[in-house]
Amino acid sequence: MIRHLAIMGIVLITLPLMNISAQKAEKSIGIQLWSVRDDMKKDAAGTIKQLGEMGYTFVEAAGYADGQFYGMSPEAFSKLLNANGLSFTASHCGHPLPDKEQWEATMQWWDQCIDAHARAGAKYIVQASMDKKGYGSLADLKRYCDYFNAVGEKCNAEGIRFGYHNHDKEFEEVDGMVRYDYMLQNTDPDKVMFQLDLYWIMKGGKEATAYFEQYPKRFELWHVKDEMELGQSGKMDFEPIFKKAELAGMKDIIVEVERYNYTPLESVERSLSFLMEAPYVK
C-alpha cells in the first residue's frame, strides 16, 4: 500500500511536467534574434543554446552581412542551430530601393544574399522596412513594389519565399491610399508574402482580422509582439487574431521583444510561456 501511494505521488508530480513537455513538442514557435541582439553579439553559441532549452523550435535571424550570419558561414550557422534543436526558418535583411544606375549591383547583392540563405536552409527572407522613399509618394511606393516583385522572383528560383515586415507607418495614408493596402494590391502574391507585425498594426490603428478578410492567405509569417513581454500591456487581444490564422494563411509565428522589464533572455522566455499557455495558439 505504501509503495502504491509512493508511485501515485511520483505520477502526480510528473504529470504537470509531462504536460509542459507535450506543449513544447506540439507548438512550434520561433524567436526573432533581434530580441536578444546584445546576447548574440557577446555569445552567439551560448544564446542559441539557451533559446533551444527554453523550447523555441526555430529562429528568425537579424544578423546577415556579407554572406555570413553573425560572423559565421551559412553552414556553420545552420549547424549551430541544428545542434540545439532549432531550425532556420526566416531572416530579416534587405537592401534599399536602388536607382536605375544601382540596379545591377543591387541585384548582385541579392544573388549573394539569397545564395547564403539557401545554403543555410532558410525558408524566408524578409525585408524589415523601407527607406524614406517608400514612405513618400505612391509613385515611389510603386517602384518599391516592383522591386520587391523582382526580388521575390529571384528568391522563388532558389526555393525561398520573400516577404515584407510592417511597422506602423505603412498604415498611414498617402494620396488617399493606405500604404499597406497599396503594397498588398501591387505585389504579386506568388512572389511576395507579408509578415504581419501584430503590435505595429495595432499601433497603426488598424485591425489584423480586417486585413485577413480583405487579403486572405497573404500573411504567412506573424510577429507576435507586445509593448514589452507578451501579455504585459493589456493592449493586445491575440485570441481573435489567432482564430483567423487559417484565413490569414499563417504558417509560422515568431516572438519579438524589443523593450524589456527583465533581461532580454528572461523576457523572451516569459513571452514563450505566454504562448505555450494560450489555448488559442495551436
Regions found by a protein language model. Name each.
Residues 7, 21-123, 217, 273, ...:
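N-terminal pre-domain/capping segments
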Residues 49, 53, 75, 79, ...:
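Solvent-exposed, polar/charged alpha-helical surfaces in well-ordered, non-transmembrane soluble domains
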